[in-house]
Amino acid sequence: TVYMLPQSIVSVSIATALFTKIASAAADGNQTSMVRNYQIGVRSSLLLTMWMAAILGAAAIPVFQILGPSNAISEMVAYANALVIILPGLAGAVVIIFSQRVFYSMEDGRPVFYTVLWPTLGQVVLGWTLMMFLPPVYWLFGALFAETVSRIVQGVLSTYFVRARLPQANPWVVIGDMVKYGAIAVGAGLLGMGALHFVGAFDTSNTVTGAIWGGFWRAV
């Protein structure tokens, strides 16, 4: 649920709003408008989604402390690590959801199937391969890493399927946005994580963060 918040709030909302324009342009045969709205949707969603992903990644442990205050710190750290591993996959998920809108507007579901098929098979292979070489305690992290790679590959692959239908859609424009906003999110997340660690976000009982949260909940 926490992982899907950025996509549910941002990507789905923007994709729903732009789908009407994309579908209308498809009905009129206006490929230029389709490409423009597709790229605008991807860029704006990547900006906001990866911003939210950076916040969630940096504040992963405080978030899980709020959701499960009675859980042990070790459990929260494990949840937080799992969340951080899969968050980069949101970049691919953003591109996928807008690429799907392009295919749906052209009433062609085949690219959607193939976009998911091959990366998913690769995910299974990569996941099992990592499990062969990792200690059992890291198997879950290996599986999550494989899922993240699969989502990113799905996003990249979908841009080429879009170009096959819309020659004006340059895949590298979208891929460049994925890399740019992904790198910014990673940098911002690391800075935020460092700042929270400095003020003591990992212990809600005897820290500045704990005092803030305690005061907030008492006020509520």
Task: Locate predicted features.
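Membrane-embedded alpha-helical bundles of multi-pass transporters/translocases
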Residues: 1-220
